[in-house]
Each structure stands twice: as C-alpha cells, then as structure tokens.
Amino acid sequence: MKRIGLITLIAAICLALGMMVNPTPVVAKTTFVTIGTGGITGVYYPTGGAIARIVNQKRKVYGIRCTVESTGGSVFNVNAVMSGDLEFGVVQSDRQYQAINGLAEWEEKGPQKDLRAVFTIHPEAITLVAADDAGIKTIADLKGKRVNIGNPGSGQRQNSIDALEVNGINYETDLVAEGVKAAEAPGLLQDGRIDAFFYTVGHPSGAIKEATAGRRKVHFVDIPNIDQLTKKFPYYAKAFVPIKFYEGATNKEDVETFGVKATLVTSAKVPDKVVYAVTKEVFDNYEEFKKLHPAYEVLTKENMLEGMSAPIHPGAMKYYKETGLDKYLK
C-alpha cells in the first residue's frame, strides 16, 4: 500500500510540474477579412492591397488578417458586401449613393440599408481614350464608332452612359457599344478591335499606360457639358486627366472631364472592432499610406472624409471622434 501511495504521489508531482513547465498555449483567434477591389491593372486592386498591407502590420495586435480580391468592380462589391461574401469593398462614390438610395441597379431591390461608409480615397476621372486613326476629335465623333463603355454592372458603364447622354448621344443606337471589362479595353484598342473606350479610374493607371504605350497612337478626348452633369448628379465633380503620367499619348495638355471618388464601404453587420482597426491603421499611418500609390498624392485626412452618402460605420466613427476628425464629416 505504501509503494502504491508513493507511486501515486510521484505521478501527481510530475503532472503538476509538467503543467507548470509546459502550459497549454492560448492561441488568439484570427479574423479573416477580404476587400473587394477591381481589375488588377486599375487602381482599385492596389488600393485594396495598400489597405491590407497597412492593417496586416498589426495583425498580431488585432487578430485580423486582411486579403484582397480582384472583382468586377463597384456594383459587384456592394452586392458582395451586402450578402456577406466580402467584409469591405472599394466602390465609386456614385454607386455608394445609388445603393443607399435604391437607385440604378438597386431600383428593384430597394435601398441597401445595411451599407456603411468607412472613408474615401482617391479621385477618379471618367477617361475617354481614342485611337488617333479613328477620326475621333470630340465626343460627338463617337457616333458610328465601336466604343467600350464598360461591363454591365460596373460603375464606369453608367458614367459612360451619363457622359454620352449629356452630349446628345444614345449608346444603344448611335454607336456600337462594347461591354467588356476595363482591363481588357487597352488590348482591344491596340488590336484595332475598338476605336475608343471609357474608363473611370484614378491616375496614373496601369491600364491607361498600356493603352498609350502601344504601336497604335492614342489620345484623350475632352468631355464637355460637365456643368449640366454636376447639376443633375450631386456625386459628380469636375476633374481632369493629367498628361504628365502618359508620355505615349499625343495630347499636349491636361484634358477636362468629370469624376467621382473611390470609397471604402462595409456592412452594418461587420463588427465595430474590425472596422475600427482598419480605419485607425490607415489614418494613423496616413503618410505611409500616401506613398503606396501616386494616385494618393492629393489625399488629405480631411478630403478622405468627403463624398460619402451611406451612414458612417460605428467602428469608423469611434476613431473619428477620438481624433477630432469627425468635424470634417459632412
């Protein structure tokens, strides 16, 4: 009995010592979040990458792992965020306005009441690129031409239609409208399969550089009657295409057009702590963020709070109130 008791005592001591020396590690649960962007040659994709890079630097602090997905663009991103397939999406400011108000693609579904704004990013110019040999000097010259206006469901498609209609051009009857993704248009233009294309994009853009660097010479076309557009649609503003980024274009001066802003949206169902972390890391590392793409050169903390139509997510609002940035919200 004594022998058995001694063995039991030794076993108990060993077990206790083992627990003290090798405690079971507590592993923090990682929350995976995905940002929906756009084509890989546009600015949305690197924008999502820039946000993810900043946030992932503190992944051990927040327990958040951020990834990026190339998507069909704004409309897809809104719908994917609303369905829970994405936690965040980069969306044109006009599409944010339309979604929260139940307009355009959301007319049948109605207002997307759970859509929430986080912040805005770079300005995006509605850019019209035409081949020099296609005889297109003005937007009126697009009549009878083969023009890519953007894939169905993309923000740029509606921008293209608005630009055409304000100038008296019906995209269904006055031209041969193609509906391919913006990233494919430069190749089609260089191959001679289209005469021109619209692209709503921040500058500089890899896709636009591709279009202007080919053997077929191209130029940018002014879009007139912008005052009528901005009066009718509150989310549009005057903009320009900066020629300095595109040495291959045959233009000599910047080109007038109109534009929107890229915005980051999420859902009301995404936890406050996740949205707070994303907001805090981007704004706390604002100077580093600005260096991640030339399109961010014009950013200020103040103008990153302009152009939002949906309610601000509580997680983002918490950060803005903590830092006093909420005074810039309109």
Q: What are these model-derived regions, one by one?
A:
Residues A52-R53, T67-K109, L128, A183-L188, ...:
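Pocket-flanking alpha-helical
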Residues M1-A11:
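Bacterial N-terminal signal peptides that target proteins for export
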Residues L15-P25:
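C-terminal segment of classical bacterial N-terminal signal peptides
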Residues E184, D191, V201-N225, K231-K232, ...:
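An extracytoplasmic/periplasmic, membrane-proximal ligand-sensing/linker region
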Residues F32-K58, T120, E124-D191, E306, ...:
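Bilobed "Venus flytrap"/periplasmic-binding protein-like clamshell domains
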Residues S93-R95, A104-E105, A134, Y171-L264, ...:
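Pocket-lining segment of extracytoplasmic ligand-binding domains
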Residues K145-D162, Y236-M308:
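Ligand-binding clefts/hinges and TM-proximal coupling segments of bilobed small-molecule sensing domains
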Residues V26-T30:
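Boundary at the C-terminal end of the N-terminal hydrophobic targeting segment
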